Amino acid sequence: MDAYIISGYRTAVGKAGKGGFKSTRPDDLAVEVIQQLINNTPGLEPAMVDDVLVGCANPEGEQGLQIGRLIAVRALGKDVPGMTVNRYCASGLETISIAVAKIQAGMGHCYVAGGAESMSLIPMTGYKLAPNYNIAANTPDYLVGMGLTAEAVAQKYGITREASDAFSLRSHERAAEAIAAGKFRDEIVPIEVKEVWVENDKRRERSFVVDTDEGVRRDTSLEGLAKLKPAFANGGIVTAGNASQTSDGASFVLVMSEEMMKQLGLQPVARLAACAVAGVDPLYMGIGPVAAIPKALKQAGMQLGQIEQIELNEAFAAQALAVIQEAGLNPELVNVNGGAIALGHPLGCTGAKLTVQILNEMRRRKQKYGMVTACVGGGQGIAGIFERLN
């Protein structure tokens, strides 16, 4: 049984700790996006959804209590199940591949798949970092911080500070151009945020709408980037300016069987032609896509030259440049509207967010094949190949 993506939406991406979503629960964001999916799909009732699959990289605290099920109950009702999926930065794309696989296996007809993450509310390491001492003794590289893995990748693959800063500038410039052109407008669900606080013993409140990605710095320059100090290693090349931003956001797509799609008289947007994951040395985790991309191409029976557009998650500029170099990617096809350095990286949401973005840009450019790929903390990579339909 074939599976198709019918539609997809996302929130704008907020700056963690200082942006519009800094006090907003991630399940609140997810509910708004999912309800938009359902409301904009003629004939689809909430009870017709077989499962809600929610990617989340730190499912604890405000993202605990099995956030996938919690979101399903709130968005669609108690009769719709939900689960939480965690493959760190790949979680949002992983949920889409699970939904597709379940439909292809005949296990269901309709899935909501994506992810949600609040990096404002949950720290990067979670609330209790408690690694097994055997990890430190036997596989110490697994515990190396993400910034230091980017430094390791840069050193191994010869990526310079100058190249990293130039790549970061490109990300901001392209993202600013995309926002100015309104490219993200139709895919973003505007979120009304209400804030309440006490000031001078008086209750204060305000409401505002978040409908634009907040991380883009339109005044970024090479001179400004060059002044930033290394963030993780003395003499290193990774700075706050050439690393992805910590972010808040949610994104989901509707995945449906051909049978249900025809029953409802719907048209598909795309199909997932392949999705592969791979393991790499945790010390060089950023190179993960180089291992995953060939596996995905082999699954799809395709050559790299057939891919017309690529969304490569910019965990770090050094990491992205190393992937482009080692995987033989055409830089002009990569992140045509900017990437995570400018637009943000809300961990468990990112894979779905990039899927929504690339499908819309492929439609504008009338392209057939696109790829979403990302490195994954702990030493993994993921790559998904999408075929645009209609």
Identify what each model region corresponds to.
Residues 117, 123-124, 128-129, 147-152, ...:
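Conserved N-terminal phosphate-binding loop of PLP-dependent enzymes in the Aspartate aminotransferase
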